[in-house]
């Protein structure tokens, strides 16, 4: 499923896979003990997500990725997935983080529309800049 979705999203594939294939990519994340989830609609897979409940960078949960089948894009699946992951984490955590390459403005905009707020920029060990975003998980008082 991940390989199929990666092929359908070449920008994401280039950014995330680099020169790896899907299997090597998943293996590279195995040390983080995160959760890969396949999301279905009417019994058919339409999306894949990855999140960590605890990241070594700050001890907090992080959203790694959400990939949607192109035939199912713009139907609210990604927002629903982010909300479901938020609900899973809400009992134990107050916020969830995400890191996006700074030049991927459309990804930053989308996460902002899903309740993430821009927190800061950071550079990785290779000097690449990332926007770090945070999404409050506590339910708003009514």
Swiss-Prot record:
Single GO MF descriptor: acyltransferase activity, transferring groups other than amino-acyl groups
Domain N-acetyltransferase: 1-138
Family matches, as Gene3D superfamilies: 3.40.630.30
Pfam families: Acetyltransf_1
Protein name per UniProt: Uncharacterized protein YkzC
Source organism of this protein record: Bacillus subtilis (strain 168)
Taxonomic classification: Bacteria, Bacillati, Bacillota, Bacilli, Bacillales
Gene: ykzC
């Amino acid at each position: 499923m991940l390989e199929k979705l990666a092929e359908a999203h070449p920008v994401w594939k280039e950014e995330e896979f680099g020169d790896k294939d899907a299997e090597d990519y998943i293996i590279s994340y195995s040390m983080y003990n995160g959760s890969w989830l396949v999301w279905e609609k009417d019994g058919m897979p339409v999306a894949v997500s990855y999140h960590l409940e605890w990241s070594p960078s700050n001890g907090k949960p992080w959203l790694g990725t959400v990939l949607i089948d192109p035939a199912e894009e713009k139907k609210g699946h990604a927002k629903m997935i982010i909300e479901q992951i938020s609900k899973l984490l809400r009992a134990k955590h107050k916020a969830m983080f995400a890191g996006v390459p700074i030049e991927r403005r459309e990804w930053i905009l989308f996460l902002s529309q899903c309740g993430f707020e821009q927190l800061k920029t950071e550079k990785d060990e290779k000097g690449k800049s990332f926007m770090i975003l945070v999404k409050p998980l506590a339910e708003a008082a009514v």
